[in-house]
């Protein structure tokens, strides 16, 4: 008789946080980066939900739906359980424990034979109702959880959260959150590097390279990528003016009613002729992202991305982050993105988190 196969239930969620009302930072968020990590932590509130089925307090989270990524599930589940539309921030951690221990105060993750729940967590921030409305078509609907699933939510300090959380694994995740804040996670701004979707081959295309379009398969990839980009609430869209880059972000621009800024210095020809000028144009987008505190998505070409990576690796806070910016062509697959979280330091921009963003095409 064959052994029973282990079942893994995939889930996702996050620690939703905000600046405490009345705090200096809440009154002027631009001052956050000038505060110490402890001052930031003292000014932060996190959201905890109560599950009547288990009579416990935990982070908002839930199971993945069919054809859904972890990041999309995290944003959707947080919205369903808290009523707050959010955008994702730096990644936190993964937690795994036997399903039989769901709802128990202490969880043990060492049993590799039992049916298991595997959950990924992010930092997440509430967004405005207006931003949520702009994202609706790209992200999809979010329906509030039934009172039988979640019957209470509270916003508490980090110190209070340690006392209220029911589970050891949730307290461990809170410790990771504190570490993230200490390295700048609460002031990090998000820049998404998008590689255009699959385009017609140079060999078969009879027009100019600037007018070479994406393929029908590429269009499907671009459409699916919109759902993933929406998880980060990109309110600024920028692109090389060449057609394949425009087409990759075009539907997202239409869905969110956000205009696309064309950056001539980010075309393949411009980069080949003046790579330093291309970097200065990209560097200006980093500055604008930090100053505006808005998420920016920039669509570019393979060789341009490789050139930008050469500079960005030097901005990474850790060597293992720099290794995620591949030094060998093609650098990243077509129709995907890299999500960079950047903080402003006296020495200049510093990248503290990098996430690969890939769509599910079905």
Range-by-range predicted roles:
Residues 183, 283-348:
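Active-site-adjacent alpha-helix immediately C-terminal to a catalytic or transition-state-stabilizing loop
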Residues 96-139:
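Active-site-adjacent beta-strand/loop module that shapes the phosphate/pyrophosphate-binding cleft
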Residues 36-87, 205-212:
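Conserved Nudix-box catalytic region and its N-terminal flanking loop in Nudix hydrolases
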Residues 85-95, 258-264:
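A short coil-to-beta-strand element that immediately follows conserved catalytic motifs
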Residues 166, 171, 175-183, 187-189, ...:
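Non-catalytic terminal regions with compositionally biased, polar/charged low complexity
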Residues 62, 186-274, 306, 316-319, ...:
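Active-site-proximal alpha-helix that buttresses catalytic centers in soluble enzyme cores
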Residues 55-56, 133-195, 201:
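Nudix hydrolase/Nudix homology domain
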Residues 2-59, 192-196:
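N-terminal strand-loop-strand
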């Amino acid at each position: 008789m064959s052994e029973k196969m282990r079942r893994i239930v995939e889930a996702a969620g996050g620690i939703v946080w905000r600046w405490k009302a009345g705090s200096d930072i809440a009154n002027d968020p631009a001052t956050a980066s000038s505060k110490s990590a402890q001052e930031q932590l003292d000014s932060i509130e996190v959201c905890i939900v109560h599950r009547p089925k288990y009579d416990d307090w935990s982070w908002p989270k839930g199971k993945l739906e069919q054809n859904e990524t972890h990041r999309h599930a995290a944003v959707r589940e947080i919205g369903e359980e808290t009523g707050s539309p959010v955008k994702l921030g730096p990644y936190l951690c993964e937690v795994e424990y036997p399903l039989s221990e769901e709802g128990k105060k202490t969880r043990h993750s060492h049993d590799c034979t039992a049916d298991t729940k595997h959950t990924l967590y992010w930092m997440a921030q509430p967004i405005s109702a207006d931003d949520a409305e702009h994202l609706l078509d790209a992200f999809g609907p979010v329906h509030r959880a039934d009172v039988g699933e979640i019957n209470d939510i509270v916003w508490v300090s980090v110190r209070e959260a340690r006392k209220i959380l029911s589970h050891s694994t949730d307290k461990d995740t809170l410790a990771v959150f504190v570490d993230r804040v200490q390295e700048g996670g609460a002031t990090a701004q998000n820049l998404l590097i998008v590689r255009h979707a699959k385009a017609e081959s140079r060999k078969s295309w009879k027009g100019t390279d600037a007018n070479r379009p994406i393929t029908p398969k590429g269009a499907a990839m671009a459409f699916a990528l919109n759902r993933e980009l929406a998880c980060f609430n990109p309110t600024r869209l920028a692109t090389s003016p060449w057609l394949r880059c425009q087409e990759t972000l075009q539907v997202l621009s239409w869905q969110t009613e956000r205009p696309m800024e064309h950056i001539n210095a980010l075309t393949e020809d411009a980069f080949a002729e003046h790579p330093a000028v291309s970097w200065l144009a990209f560097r200006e987008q980093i500055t604008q992202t930090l100053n505006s505190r808005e998420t920016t998505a920039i669509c570019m070409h393979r060789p341009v991305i490789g050139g930008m990576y050469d500079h960005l690796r030097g901005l990474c806070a850790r060597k293992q982050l720099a290794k995620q910016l591949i030094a060998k062509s093609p650098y990243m697959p077509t129709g995907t993105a890299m999500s960079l979280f950047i903080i402003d330091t006296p020495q200049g921009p510093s990248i503290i988190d990098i996430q690969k963003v890939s769509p599910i095409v079905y």
